[in-house]
């Protein structure tokens, strides 16, 4: 049960929790604004999303604005990060960069630090490298509400006019916030109730966001970790690996005679496990195990 306690901690479950039925918009769907980079999703879109968010949570409320941004390992994630930062700071927001990190970590940082107004994750999850997306997370660590999304879409379509620029000392700043990601790693480690010493754990990081975080957690808990697909190059995210190609992990676990294995998708908000025989432990069983554990404790 402890493996699931670590991998499906409150933050991962919280982010995936459905609060309401979301109606598909022109740009934003059930999991953000997603499309092929520089086709359906462009840097102009990202810049305008940043401009609106910075104004909406800042000047429009006559207050300062703080936004945290994370990204996955796609080549295009960097240009979208720069575009978002430009838009946010131009509207007066201060931006805190977690750099390459997981979607649940962004939700965790936003929810647990009182002064963040929202979080943004740049990722297209399990999609191919040429796609990308912008996920918006509110200050409760949940998906952005439909009313805010509707206002952003109206701004993208030019229906709500321009938002004012910041000037002078009102222009926002950019902060390296790797410490936030490290705090999330510490949080995951704290969920364990005992050492994993002697356990042999396989990890398929999908050449994505989990490539550094997952190993750090299991190493700290004393497990012997065996990692595959943890050398991202900007183009190999989700390519014949990760949670959408579970056979790769199944073969790896059986070949290395491991106790258990976990496969993530590109932004590590999805995880599938296999047991020592390579049998798949899917999301339904995850929920059952977590529910049973919570009931018993």
Where on the chain are the PLM-derived regions?
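Short, Lys/Arg-enriched N-terminal segments with co-localized hydrophobic residues
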Residues: 1-23
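N-terminal small/polar loop signature for handling phosphorylated ligands or for N-terminal nucleophile
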Residues: 66-131, 216-274
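A short, N-terminal amphipathic alpha-helix
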Residues: 52-60, 251, 292-296
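An N-terminal, well-structured beta->alpha segment
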Residues: 15-86, 90-91, 174-199
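Gly/Ser/Thr-enriched, mixed-charge loops and adjacent short helices
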Residues: 36, 132-254
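A short glycine/serine-rich beta->alpha loop
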Residues: 36-40, 93-96, 276-280
């Amino acid at each position: 049960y402890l493996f699931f306690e670590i991998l499906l901690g409150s933050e991962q479950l919280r982010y995936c929790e459905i609060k309401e039925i979301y109606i598909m918009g022109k740009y934003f769907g059930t999991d953000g604004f997603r499309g092929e980079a520089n086709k359906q999703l462009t840097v102009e879109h990202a810049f305008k999303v940043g401009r609106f968010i910075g104004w909406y949570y800042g000047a429009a409320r006559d207050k300062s604005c703080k936004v945290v941004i994370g990204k996955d390992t796609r080549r295009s994630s960097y240009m979208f990060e720069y575009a978002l930062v430009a838009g946010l700071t131009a509207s007066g927001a201060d931006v805190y960069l977690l750099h390459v990190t997981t979607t649940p970590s962004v939700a965790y940082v936003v929810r647990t630090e009182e002064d963040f107004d929202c979080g943004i994750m740049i990722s297209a999850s399990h999609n191919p490298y040429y796609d990308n997306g912008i996920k918006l997370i509110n200050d409760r660590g949940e998906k952005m509400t439909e009313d805010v999304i509707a206002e952003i879409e109206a701004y993208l379509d030019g229906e709500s006019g321009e938002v004012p620029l910041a000037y002078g000392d009102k222009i926002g700043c950019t902060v390296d916030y790797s410490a936030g990601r490290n705090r999330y790693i510490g949080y995951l480690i704290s969920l364990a109730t005992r050492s994993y010493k002697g356990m042999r754990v396989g990890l398929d990081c999908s050449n994505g966001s989990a490539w550094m975080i997952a190993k750090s957690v299991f190493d700290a808990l004393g497990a012997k970790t065996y990692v595959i697909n943890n050398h991202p190059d900007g183009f190999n995210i989700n390519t014949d690996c990760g949670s959408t190609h579970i056979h790769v992990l199944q073969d790896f676990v059986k070949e290395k005679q491991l106790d258990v294995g976990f496969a993530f998708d590109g932004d590590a908000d999805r995880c599938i496990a296999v047991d020592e025989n390579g049998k798949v432990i899917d999301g339904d069983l995850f929920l059952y195990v977590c529910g049973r554990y919570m009931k018993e404790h």
